[in-house]
Amino acid sequence: MALVMLARAPAPPLLLPSPNPPPCALPQDLTSLVSPSEPPDPPDPPDYLVGASNSFLSILLLRSSDLGSDLVQALSPLDLGFALRSITAVCSSWYQVFPLACLELWFSIPHLSHPLVTLSKGFVSLKGSNFFEFFTFFWNMPSFILQFPHHEDVMISTSFRLVLPQYEAVMILLKLKLFLPHYEDVLFSIGLRIQLLLPQYEVGLILYKLRLLLPHYEDVIQKLWLRAIHVIVSLVWFLEISRRIKEKTYDVLTRNDLGSWTPDLFIEKWWFSQPHTSPKLRFFSHLVGSRNHHGSLSSLAHYMVQEKLEQMIRETQEATHQEKIRQQKMRRRRRRSEGSISSTKFIVMMAMEKCSFDPRKDFRDSMVEMIVANKIKEADELRSLLEYYLSMNPREYRSAILEIFYEVCADLFRS
């Protein structure tokens, strides 16, 4: 059953303070939690104010001078009480000029002493002068708090801003905070930027910001963020190509020109083919200098693709450089080992295992004998001899071998 009221007014009404909100019908599972009270007699609603009652539908009244009569729209039954302070609108044409004087919606939700849901008051205000000159919409939504047994609070807050048409953007901000028990604080924040134009244009959706902070899971978060970037780039690229196909198809059908229109689809050059300026400079200069309705889509796509390609190029160059360095080290080691084998071939043939009671004296005598007998004087030959001693003996003798080798060389080659 719906309550319909028709009222004519020669002039827009003035804003008046809202009366106390009338009582509302609660769900059956919440009636036991609210103390029963005798509802007061609601005041007679004026022609510009319609309120909700216990057994009737909520009525929304909208005044429009161009229609010649008031428009009354019945909403679905609501379990929430709300009241309209005033609505004043002047509409000349839906697709042309839409000057708006003032619209303000005030609603009050009774405090529910329920362990799961807690709501508060809020309002919706809409003010502007001309639809094609300046249009602003702001929604201050009350905090929505959920409380679950053995869990912490979960808070969701939303805010909407609409600025048309010179800015051509609808900003929708959604913040979600989660607190998990037995864990550190988890912050999950999502920001959405939606580009919404008039019906004759298209609607585009861009994921503007995604932030997820989880302690001890930085690597997983980084991988998820990289995947999200890939999805965003694919989505934006698909929307951009779909828009161009749509426009070209419309032009062909209207002009009956079935010529070569496919190459014109990609007539705009991608920014990664222009290496003369940096991607950030191209990105921000394009956003500031252009005001067309698809500038943000193409700018974001081009910037992300450019940044990803440059990152891939840097990684490839670094990998190539590291590979070259590794190959050079391997060649040096190969030459060193080959030189060591060629210069110490006679030493290897004369190697023998010996049980020594004085290793330092035996190492010294052996080194002196090898240097004198083979007339070793070059630095490469001495280095090969040292590497031979180090490789043929256990690790615990390395310090002694190095010390004795230094003493032998200092004594034999002292000028």
From Swiss-Prot:
Main location: nucleus
Keyword DNA damage: no
Record's compositionally biased regions (Pro residues): 10-25
Region annotated Disordered, chain positions: 10-45, 316-340
Composition bias type Basic residues, residue spans: 327-336
Presence of the UniProt keyword Nucleus in the record: yes
Localization, UniProt: Nucleus
Domain called OVATE: residue spans: 352-411
Record Pfam families: Ovate (PF04844)
Ranges of biased composition (kind: Basic and acidic residues): 316-326
Disulfide bond entries: none
A cellular component annotation (GO) from this entry: nucleus
GO biological process, one term: negative regulation of DNA-templated transcription
InterPro entries: Ovate (IPR038933), Ovate_C (IPR006458)
Keywords assigned by UniProt, alphabetized: Nucleus, Repressor, Transcription, Transcription regulation
Extra facts: Plants over-expressing OFP9 have no visible phenotype.
Biological function: Probable transcriptional repressor that may regulate multiple aspects of plant growth and development.
Protein name (Swiss-Prot/TrEMBL): Probable transcription repressor OFP9
Source lineage: Eukaryota, Viridiplantae, Streptophyta, Embryophyta, Tracheophyta
Annotated gene: OFP9
